[in-house]
């Protein structure tokens, strides 16, 4: 029985050591010469922000099949600092003040 508990530990240790050897940094400094390399804070400010969509119905729609949509909406509103919330008829989470 000890074999079944010791063998997975040995496999994990060997896998970690193998990944550590593969993740070792290279001797050269190829990043500085790469054309997509961004250097400095000023260059980061020039980059365009990524656009993303906000889906307000995700809390109420996705969790409605397990009947936890109102609880999830209330928890979401509590995390936002509100006093709670509920899902309305359009499946949108509405937070209280």
Curated annotation (Swiss-Prot):
<comment type="similarity">
    <text>Belongs to the invertebrate defensin family. Type 1 subfamily.</text>
</comment>
<dbReference type="InterPro" id="IPR001542">
    <property type="entry name" value="Defensin_invertebrate/fungal"/>
</dbReference>
<feature type="propeptide">
    <location>
        <begin position="24"/>
        <end position="57"/>
    </location>
</feature>
<dbReference type="GO" id="GO:0045087">
    <property type="term" value="P:innate immune response"/>
</dbReference>
<keyword id="KW-0732">Signal</keyword>
<dbReference type="InterPro" id="IPR036574">
    <property type="entry name" value="Scorpion_toxin-like_sf"/>
</dbReference>
<keyword id="KW-0391">Immunity</keyword>
<dbReference type="GO" id="GO:0050830">
    <property type="term" value="P:defense response to Gram-positive bacterium"/>
</dbReference>
<comment type="function">
    <text>Antibacterial peptide active mostly against Gram-negative bacteria. Its activity is enhanced by lipopolysaccharide.</text>
</comment>
<keyword id="KW-0399">Innate immunity</keyword>
<protein>
    <recommendedName>
        <fullName>Defensin-2</fullName>
    </recommendedName>
</protein>
<feature type="disulfide bond">
    <location>
        <begin position="60"/>
        <end position="87"/>
    </location>
</feature>
<keyword id="KW-0044">Antibiotic</keyword>
<keyword id="KW-0211">Defensin</keyword>
<dbReference type="Pfam" id="PF01097">
    <property type="entry name" value="Defensin_2"/>
</dbReference>
<keyword id="KW-1015">Disulfide bond</keyword>
<dbReference type="GO" id="GO:0006959">
    <property type="term" value="P:humoral immune response"/>
</dbReference>
<feature type="disulfide bond">
    <location>
        <begin position="77"/>
        <end position="95"/>
    </location>
</feature>
<keyword id="KW-0964">Secreted</keyword>
<keyword id="KW-0165">Cleavage on pair of basic residues</keyword>
<dbReference type="GO" id="GO:0005615">
    <property type="term" value="C:extracellular space"/>
</dbReference>
<feature type="signal peptide">
    <location>
        <begin position="1"/>
        <end position="23"/>
    </location>
</feature>
<feature type="disulfide bond">
    <location>
        <begin position="73"/>
        <end position="93"/>
    </location>
</feature>
<keyword id="KW-0929">Antimicrobial</keyword>
